[in-house]
């Protein structure tokens, strides 16, 4: 019997820090306007969206702070800028919705994950509100309690 081929994960990069530092109120999927070398680098998994956020200019949305490291084999006649701003591909209704929510007090749009959908690179952006220090501490307490609860249940089941 032949082995089943491993299914590769569609996720390229995650922004775990965003969920720690923000309350995510809404998530939207957006396309990215990429150059050829960027697509090759994404296929190799060389992306970081840890410090990325979305800004609006002239009625369009742009992703700032995302780093896509060029491959060593990248073309020499093209200038590869790893931190260039990349245009988000959203329809007018989604842009207006995001822009209206960002104009509210304390709201921002952050990149949550970068992934493949069929052959297209997509970014999941979230409309977020910043957490205070005590909110972060509550999250840590809840997480630790869940781990302790699992440990107690595991030991109780052993009998």
From Swiss-Prot:
Keywords, A to Z, come to: Cytoplasm, RNA-binding
The family database entries (CDD domains) matched by this protein are listed as: SmpB
- Its predominant location is cytoplasm
Q: Tell me where in or outside the cell this protein is found.
A: Cytoplasm
InterPro entries on file: SmpB, SsrA-bd_prot, SsrA-bd_prot_CS
Write one Gene Ontology MF term: RNA binding
So which domain of life are we looking at?
Bacteria
Return the GO cellular component terms, semicolon-separated.
cytosol
Q: Name one GO biological process term.
A: trans-translation
Does the record's keyword annotation contain Ribonucleoprotein? Answer: no
What does the protein in this record do? Required for rescue of stalled ribosomes mediated by trans-translation. Binds to transfer-messenger RNA (tmRNA), required for stable association of tmRNA with ribosomes. tmRNA and SmpB together mimic tRNA shape, replacing the anticodon stem-loop with SmpB. tmRNA is encoded by the ssrA gene; the 2 termini fold to resemble tRNA(Ala) and it encodes a 'tag peptide', a short internal open reading frame. During trans-translation Ala-aminoacylated tmRNA acts like a tRNA, entering the A-site of stalled ribosomes, displacing the stalled mRNA.
Assigned protein family: Belongs to the SmpB family.
Designated name of the protein:
SsrA-binding protein
Gene symbol here is smpB
């Amino acid at each position: 019997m032949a082995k089943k081929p491993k299914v590769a994960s569609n996720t390229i990069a995650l922004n775990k820090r965003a969920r720690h530092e923000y309350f995510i109120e809404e998530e939207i999927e957006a396309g990215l306007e990429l150059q050829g070398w960027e697509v090759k680098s994404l296929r190799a998994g060389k992306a970081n969206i840890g410090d990325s956020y979305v800004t609006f200019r002239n009625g369009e949305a742009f992703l700032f702070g995302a780093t896509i490291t060029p491959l060593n084999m990248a073309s020499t006649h093209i200038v590869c800028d790893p931190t260039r701003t990349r245009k988000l591909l959203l329809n007018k209704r989604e842009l207006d919705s995001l822009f209206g929510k960002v104009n509210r007090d304390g709201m921002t749009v952050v990149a949550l994950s970068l992934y493949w959908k069929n052959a297209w690179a997509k970014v999941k952006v979230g409309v977020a509100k910043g957490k205070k220090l005590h909110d972060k501490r509550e999250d840590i307490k809840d997480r630790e309690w869940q781990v302790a609860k699992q440990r107690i249940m595991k030991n109780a089941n052993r009998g």
